[in-house]
């Protein structure tokens, strides 16, 4: 059985900061709490026997840093492969804007539809069909290995960690081919530092759990 862990990077704003909509064009590092969340992610993976065999992130520093810290805290020395398909979405005119300005432009209803149904607001430079295709292709490759000697494709069993951002993570459950059922059972957003777990068994993907928030107080 292949296990796919989707994790959101840790915090990029401190408690007293004014947060903005951080997208693909805003490359921010983790703040101290974000580093603690990354460490808690690693501890969670270790405690729950979810040590990753392969690790991926986006090309943005907040995801690479989260992955690196998580691996340090779960004792895994695997490299982190940064892929652009996991970069956060481009929020267009709302990139790096405060939430009140975003709502003033697109309206609260559009933002609610984004958070509950993954319907992309007008003006954002993002194609959800491309994101879904990327997840499907990645998930398919994650479950198969090609034996170049025999030219046979085998099913594989491993644990894969992907550290990405909120906008991209919500499209991962499309690999189950029943996103509506997922959205009825779970909130589609991942909190900062949170993770979701998908498993491939009986030739299909299932969401085992979503928006798990590891306790940063556990060392």
Residue ranges and their predicted role:
Residues 69, 171-175:
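Active-site signature of alpha/beta-hydrolase-fold catalytic machinery across serine-
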Residues 108-137:
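Short glycine/proline- and acidic residue-enriched helix-loop micro-motifs
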Residues 10, 166-167:
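Active-site metal-binding loops of divalent metal-dependent hydrolases
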Residues 40-115:
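Phosphate-coordination/substrate-recognition cap region in phosphate-metabolizing enzymes
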Residues 1-2, 76, 89-103, 155-158, ...:
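Acidic, low-complexity terminal tails and accessory targeting/binding regions
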Residues 48-51, 149-158:
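Glycine-rich phosphate-binding loop signature in dinucleotide/nucleotide-binding domains
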Residues 3-7, 56, 157-164:
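Beta-strand elements within well-structured catalytic alpha/beta cores of enzymes
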Residues 1-52, 68-72, 76, 204-219:
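An N-terminal RHG(E/S)-centered segment typical of histidine phosphatases
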């Amino acid at each position: 059985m292949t296990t796919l862990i989707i994790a959101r990077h840790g915090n990029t704003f401190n408690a007293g900061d004014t947060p903005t909509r951080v997208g693909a064009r805003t490359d921010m590092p983790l703040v101290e709490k974000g580093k603690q969340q990354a460490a808690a992610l690693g501890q969670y993976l270790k405690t729950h026997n979810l040590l990753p065999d392969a690790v991926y992130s986006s090309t943005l520093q907040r995801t690479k840093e989260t992955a690196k810290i998580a691996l340090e805290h779960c004792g895994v020395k695997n490299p982190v492969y940064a892929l652009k398909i996991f970069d956060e979405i481009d929020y267009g005119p709302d990139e790096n804007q405060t939430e009140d300005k975003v709502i003033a432009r697109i309206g609260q209803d559009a933002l609610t539809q984004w958070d509950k149904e993954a319907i992309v607001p007008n003006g954002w430079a993002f194609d959800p069909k491309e994101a879904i295709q990327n997840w499907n292709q990645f998930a398919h490759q994650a479950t198969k290995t090609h034996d170049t000697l025999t030219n046979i494709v085998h099913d594989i069993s491993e644990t894969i960690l992907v550290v990405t951002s909120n906008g991209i993570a919500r499209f991962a459950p499309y690999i189950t081919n029943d996103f509506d059922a997922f959205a009825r059972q779970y909130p589609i957003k991942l909190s900062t530092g949170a993770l979701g777990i998908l498993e491939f068994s009986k030739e299909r993907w299932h969401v085992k759990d979503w928006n798990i928030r590891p306790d940063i107080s556990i060392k």
